């Protein structure tokens, strides 16, 4: 699940792998033995919800999870880590497997290709202060790396606009103007204070001035002293910036120290070593599988994102993808009233790229045909919560609640309430969450009602959630009992592997999602729109997107 700008403000772990722990929460609803065989399920038509749910088998789900892990293991990234990341061989191999599965089940399959700016580090970025105080920077404590490539050892030269001591409120515009680089010596490392403009704008100006590297340091006010930054950068126009020189971020104390050393004539030197691969036009893929049954003018999209980030991505989101594919197999023979369209999206971890591309490249008629979206995003969390998607619910990332077209709110309750009824029937509580950070977001934005499921990731499970769902406070997954952030989406941990999932949670979550899918496959109240209404909603979404990008150029990435 994507959060913020895919949580590109990095924190880096003290260890490189998760500790395998027994799940803190015992499932309430799944029996230890399945009551029907895979063969029996595949040979019959599961044309009632009871038949479908009966055929959701732990063994089937877990075997598919093992297959996804095997793909990741067989296709490591350039650093040797198991990978299903977009733009890498592991993801393409996973796409090929999904295509084979859908075709074998009788679906009409299309692989939709789009391009995106690919970036990946080889191993761990590093750096050190060579002089006047030799110090090796610890990644995640002393240094964060922006998406940039290069190795340099050079003198550090402060640029214009640095304000020390800092003013009570942020005011530094260091590096925001080419004029700040007047007199800069090409080949030096530019020392720039955080503030006013985007990190990417500062980096662009440094590159234009001939810098061989960049160190941006925190500005120094309360709350702006420690480590920040890292990950992707954008310029003032909202364009991605990936310099061919290393660009790092250091805490205020290190920046102030280097600035003072330079002003004292000590000629401080720093080494930065960021090995990476960048490709501005890497192919990525969405897998689209249409049922041969059902009314195409009343299409229900069932989606999950298929890509990973920083590794195998088994909880986020092989689990949701397996939930989707298992249901697709079990429903393949059913003559549904509405057409089911299963989509495995790429690029979700990088900013909902696949669903953005898909929803914005449908013809007006195609967009108007889609009456509903169901999203499965993280369905096997060990220390779980039970989340049900509702566009009116809270933003899990703490930001403002998105405003969607008015027509999505009431219909989104159709499937939402079906999930709630199921959880109530098996004695599980639930909580509602906004689609922000999921692929359902773009469907809601273009006026398509949506719901879905989520079981939690990263950190931190609250005491209130423990009271609802059991388990323990702290990480939802990964190193349980701690607050280190877990495995999902965490840079340089590579620990979101098969062991980071609970097969029993995966089973009862897939059953819940199966009931939602079956409900919408036969629902007669799905809202329909004219092509003109659909395009109007999409145009409004594009305008909101442009406004967000314009706003982002002023504060969030600086």
PLM features: residue spans?
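Secretory targeting and sorting signals
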Residues: 2-33
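Noncatalytic luminal/extracellular "stalk/propeptide" segments of secretory-pathway proteins
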Residues: 33, 47, 66, 70-187
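Catalytic-core environment of secreted peptidases
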Residues: 58-80, 86, 98-105, 193, ...
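Extracellular/luminal Protease-associated
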Residues: 86-88, 137-251, 429-430
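Short helix-loop-beta-strand segments that form the rim/entrance of peptidase-like active sites
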Residues: 104, 240, 330-353, 376, ...
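Soluble metallo-hydrolase cores and metallopeptidase-like ectodomains found primarily
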Residues: 145-175, 237-315, 326-329, 337
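Metal-dependent peptidase/peptidase-like ectodomains
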Residues: 296, 335-336, 345-462
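His/Asp/Glu-rich mid-to-C-terminal helical/loop segments that flank catalytic regions of hydrolases
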Residues: 460-538
